[in-house]
Structures are given as structure tokens and as C-alpha cells.
């Protein structure tokens, strides 16, 4: 009897988890773009070698109360066409996913994304969204007020946060476009491939810059702008990379 009950519970749990997963067919193409808006809580995103955007939600059941039978939920930002509190719109090669839940409620979403898509994320300060991304091979553009953590990415990157820390580890670097990483009151920690050829713009007002790259032999190429602002050509120079914070430190590390 005990074994039967356990099996029944496992079956029911599997059904619930399946019902909370939503797939968006797409292509694993660098021409494709995913836009995410208004997500709250932690937002982990993982790139993979597949063609579907897979969104899993572990948030509480969104089924309307019995009193709402025959009625549909109404949201100011769109229509829940997924069953997990999201509005999905497709235009050409761009897919836009908007979280419809109020900012007081964490969505508890996890995403798996085709690794070659570019990703754009916007999240207001009221949404307390900590974003973590790994294993993507295209452009990432994030505007938030909270923490950003990227691992095994190539860029280009355009990252902006107000009060969060930014942590980036590159696998390799796409130099087709310039990159920009900025925080107002957070620290920035970036690990670059050791042979990266880039023109760096480093800026901090009340913080400091720390690095294990050897600046001494080419110090003559470093231009001091004022305060702790510097322009520096690394490995002969290349694509433009702006890294700036107002009140935090900058850590620039050697990777593989």
C-alpha cells in the first residue's frame, strides 16, 4: 500500500510539472532574438543545442478560483496565452515574452534557450530580478536594477544595472560589435580570455580597478582621463569595451 501511494504521488507530481512547462518553437539561428520583459525573482537562463525555447514554472497554481468559472483573467500587460502567467508574441524572427504577474509575486521561471539566439531582458527596479545566464553564443542586452551573472558567454554584451553586481566569465569573445558593462553602485567582475585584443575604457568614481593582466610593459598606451578613468589597449587593441561603475570596484581577470 505504501509503495502504491508513493507511486501515485510521483505520477501526480510529474503531471503537475509537465503542465507548468511551455515550449516555443523557433530556430537555433543567430538571426533570432528573444525579448524578456518584467520577470520577477531569480531568472536562470541556459543555452543549449536545440530549437525550442523551454520555459518551466515552479510557481503556485495559476488556475482561477471556482467563482471565476467562465471568466478569463485580465492583465494590464497582455494576455496569458501560455497557462503559466506569460504573454508570448512572435514577429518575424523575434519572440517577446512578457511576465504578467504583479511585481509582488516571484514567477519562479527557468528558461532553456537555443544557444545561438540573441537575448534582451528589461526589468524594473520594483521587480527584484536577479538574472543568471550561461552557455549563450550571441548578443546579450540587459537593463535591470539588480544582480547580473553570466558564464560561458561570447557576447557582444550591453549590460546595465543600478544597484546590482555584475559577474561575467567569457568562453570566447565575439568582436563584431563593441561591448558595454555598467553598474552604478555595484561591483563588476569580468574574466576575459588571456589573448583578448580590445580597447578598454575603464571607469570608476569612488572605487578601484584590480587586474592580473600585465599593464606595465604597455603603460605608455594607457591614457588617464581623470579620477580612475583610463583608456587602455590590451594585446594591441581591437573592439571597444566600456566597463564602468560609480561606487564599486572593477575586477578584470585572465581566463583561459
Regions found by a protein language model. Give the residues of each.
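Tandem repeat domain/solenoid detector
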Residues: 156, 165, 182, 187-191, ...
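Short helix-loop boundary/capping segments
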Residues: 153, 157-160, 169-182, 196
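Bacterial Sec-dependent N-terminal signal peptides
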Residues: 1-24
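Acidic (Asp/Glu) and glycine-rich low-complexity loops/linkers
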Residues: 20-126, 132-143, 158, 175, ...
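Beta-strand-rich extracellular passenger or scaffold domains
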Residues: 121-122, 128-131, 167-168, 189-191, ...
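Extended lipid/amphipathic-ligand handling interfaces
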Residues: 41-43, 170, 248
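Hydrophobic lipid-interacting interfaces of membrane-associated proteins
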Residues: 60, 129-131, 164, 186, ...
Amino acid at each position: 500500500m505504501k509503495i502504491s501511494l508513493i507511486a501515485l504521488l510521483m505520477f501526480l507530481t510529474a503531471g503537475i510539472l509537465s503542465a507548468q512547462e511551455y515550449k516555443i518553437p523557433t530556430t537555433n539561428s543567430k538571426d533570432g532574438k528573444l525579448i524578456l520583459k518584467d520577470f520577477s525573482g531569480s531568472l536562470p537562463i541556459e543555452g543549449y543545442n536545440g530549437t525550442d525555447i523551454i520555459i518551466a514554472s515552479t510557481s503556485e497554481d495559476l488556475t482561477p478560483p471556482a467563482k471565476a468559472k467562465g471568466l478569463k483573467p485580465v492583465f494590464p500587460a497582455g494576455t496569458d496565452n501560455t497557462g503559466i502567467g506569460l504573454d508570448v508574441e512572435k514577429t518575424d524572427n523575434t519572440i517577446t515574452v512578457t511576465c504578467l504577474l504583479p511585481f509582488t509575486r516571484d514567477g519562479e521561471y527557468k528558461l532553456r534557450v537555443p544557444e545561438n539566439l540573441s537575448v534582451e531582458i528589461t526589468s524594473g527596479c520594483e521587480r527584484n530580478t536577479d538574472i543568471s545566464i550561461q552557455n549563450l553564443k550571441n548578443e546579450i542586452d540587459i537593463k535591470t536594477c539588480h544582480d547580473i551573472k553570466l558564464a560561458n558567454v561570447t557576447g557582444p554584451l550591453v549590460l546595465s544595472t543600478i544597484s546590482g553586481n555584475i559577474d561575467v566569465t567569457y568562453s570566447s569573445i565575439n568582436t563584431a560589435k563593441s561591448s558595454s558593462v555598467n553598474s552604478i553602485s555595484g561591483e563588476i567582475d569580468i574574466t576575459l580570455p588571456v589573448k583578448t585584443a580590445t580597447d578598454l575604457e575603464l571607469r570608476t568614481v569612488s572605487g578601484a580597478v584590480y587586474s592580473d593582466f600585465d599593464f606595465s610593459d604597455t603603460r605608455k598606451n594607457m591614457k588617464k582621463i581623470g579620477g580612475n578613468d583610463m583608456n587602455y589597449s590590451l594585446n594591441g587593441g581591437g573592439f571597444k569595451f566600456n566597463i564602468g561603475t560609480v561606487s564599486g570596484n572593477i575586477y578584470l581577470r585572465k581566463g583561459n
